[in-house]
Amino acid sequence: MKRVALAVTALSLLAGPAFAGEAEVFDVTKELTGAGQGRRAVNLPLVKTPEYTVNAVAVKDEIPMHRHEDGSHVLYIVSGRGTATLDNKPVALKPGIVLHIPKGVNHSIKVEGGKMTFVDFVQHSFDPNQAEKK
């Protein structure tokens, strides 16, 4: 429960300054449905500043092994189950799990039985097209 509260608090703190000018509402569930329609994953930017990015992500089957050399990621699993592999070490993923992926660590995600959604808190401004393949 503390992890959920921590993740929600972190999201609130990060999102607060980005939305200070005006309120915005995202229907994340509706936006992320593309992960079941011929796309392996959908990455929806929620907040983007020069210092950090917050994305909602839906994964249909897997995110192949890759790494980020420009900053760390913290994932909060919202729905679905699967396994993350960080430097050849498996980590079970299910709703409520918070996973820290340090800068430069090779990682992948394999979804089990459907689709997984998570919130990705990124230490830097993030472009998903710039991930380095292993």
Task: Give, region by region, the residue ranges found by the protein language model.
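A short, N-terminal "cap"/entry segment at the start of jelly-roll beta-barrel domains
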Residues: 3-4, 16-56, 130-134
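Hydrophobic core
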Residues: 9-17
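Structural motif
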Residues: 62, 81-83, 90, 106, ...
